[in-house]
Structure formats: C-alpha cells, structure tokens
Amino acid sequence: MRPRVAVIMGGYTSEHNISMKSGAVVMAHIDRDAYEVYAVHIDKDVWLVEINGNWKPIDISDFSCDDIKFDVVFNAVHGAPGENGEIQKYFDSLGIPYTGCSAQLSSLTYNKYKTLEFLEPHGLAMAKRIVLIAKDRINTDAVSYTHLRAHETP
C-alpha cells in the first residue's frame, strides 16, 4: 500500500491564494506511483479534502475523512497556521509527520524580530533594523532619516 500524503494548502491569511497555487504545484509533481496523494484545503471555517473529485470535511479530531487516514502531511500553507507553529503543534499532537521544521522553530521564525534576537548573539551579520509596533502612533512629520539612524538597533 502506498503512503497517503495530505498536501495542505490555503490558510487564514492574505497569503491564502498563493498557498493554493503552491499546493497545486506540489500536487502536480508528486509521484502518484509512489504515493496516494490528497489535496486538503485549510480555511478558518472548514478543512476539506478532495476525494475522487468531491470535497469532503476533514475530521479535525484525528485529521481523517471517512476511512482515510494520512501517513504524512506536505505543508504548503503560507502564513498562519502553516508557518507559525500552529499546524505543526496540531500534527505533533496527532503523531502525524509533516514537512518543514518543528513547531518551536516555526513559531520562532514567524516572528522576524525574535528570530534576529535569537541569532544575534551567535555572531551572525545582521542588517540594521527598526521595530515598529502596530499599536504605536508614529508622527511621520517628526521622523527623519537621521532620527531613524539614531534609534536603530545594533
């Protein structure tokens, strides 16, 4: 019996559509002689799997549909929940292996500032940067290039 691969795509962010395209590319290039491949569309409201041309809901309790259980997941989800550690934690809890890094590393690298803080002590060259917090109000009239340079992180 060939391993059953769920190619997950979609997600909860503005990257949803590009993720669907990425998933389609993966679907087009997986060796169907070696693997039994299923497209799984992840959306905030529902997760659906395509079986014989029909879309059916995934049972979230065990990531299955009808009598189909997946052996491995190919993660093509951009943004949340595919790149921030959420989906990785979910599959870890079910014991289903997946492509990509661990939940912990995914969560870290999703936050670019935290990633740079983590890497900086290891002597890697870092670009100078400024952190802007969405809730902060910025007086753009008072900000100049010189002002920004004076407040850059090392």
Where are these regions (language model features)?
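Short, surface-exposed amphipathic charged segments that create phosphate/polyanion-binding patches used
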Residues: 117, 144-145
